[in-house]
Amino acid sequence: RTFISPVERNSVFAEGSYTLSDSAKVYGEALYNKRESAQKSWRQLFPNIAAANPSNPFGEIARSIVTIPTNQEQEVEFKRAVVGITGEWSSGFLDGWSYDAYIQRAESDATYVNDIIYNDRVNATTGASACNSAAITISGPVTCQGVNWFSPSTITTGNFSDAEKAFLFTRDIGKTSYTQNLLGASLSGNLFDLPAGSIGAVVGIEARKDSINDLPGFNARNGNLWGQTSAGQTKGDDTVKEAYTELEVPLLRDIPGIKRLTFNGSFRWTDYESYGSDSTYKVSLNWQFIDALRLRGAYGTSFRAPALFELYLANQTGFIGQGSVDPCIQ
């Protein structure tokens, strides 16, 4: 027994490069990661049993409170590959500038398994009859099985008969996949010299497409989980295009009170297929008095478009907050 849920991780990483010439080198990276995790816990099952139910010995509505084990398992595989070319221009107006162009593919595939209680089958076995097959509207057709909700072994130890377990409990399996395709390129170098140093610049572009497909298990998608939230399939994609630039300008250096004073400015334009376009910027000033003392100030803007999960989230079920139904805390 352990208080910490077990997690097993395995990773493989490889990278390499090949020099084509003094000004060009191709490179590549590959990453594979697999994670397996599991959680073992306990939960309660506490349905209201109708007074006329054959398992109810009290002659009026009563609640059976049962503690049962419940487990979850997850397996996640992540794969990423990058291929690019980098180097330095050796002639023309970009002489001395560095370049980098690359493509990337990333995939994440997950399987998650949850122990669940059939909601429709609980409803079928807690009414006026031992088992009402008409109430099994989602997980059927199945042979109706009555449940002895007030059996001493069930109440005290959570042990149902094998037939009752097979009827009430199952494992719901969901799958989630994310993919990303990315293309990017950048140039960096010095524009010209100032008395305090060279003005450095970077320009770049990037385009990427992200997609998600989260498919919960059948019972989760159909709201057939007793005592648990559920959700439908979340599926969709988005394409993003970006262009950016950044300047580093040395203003002053090596004068009394100023070892180095530098201005930095950056600008980024972003266009989401789902959201539209917007731009952000940042300006900063870096004042180094001496080696051990520096003062920085910055101002910038930002924005965030909806993530895929937020953009394509399907309908969900949940629970009413306790504060809205419990008069003792209202």
Where is each model-derived feature located?
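Surface-exposed, low-complexity loop segments enriched in small/polar and acidic residues
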Residues: 1-8, 13, 17-241, 254-256, ...
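Short, conserved secondary-structure transition motifs
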Residues: 270-272, 288, 302-308
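Transmembrane beta-strand segments that form the barrel wall of outer-membrane beta-barrel proteins
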Residues: 261-273, 297-299
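Short beta-alpha junctions and helix-cap segments that line functional grooves
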Residues: 278-284, 296, 309-311
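Active-site-adjacent structural elements in folded domains
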Residues: 187, 246-250, 264-269, 279
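Feature captures outer-membrane beta-barrel proteins of Gram-negative bacteria and organelles
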Residues: 123, 243-245, 249, 279-287
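Solvent-exposed loop/turn segments connecting transmembrane beta-strands
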Residues: 237, 270-279
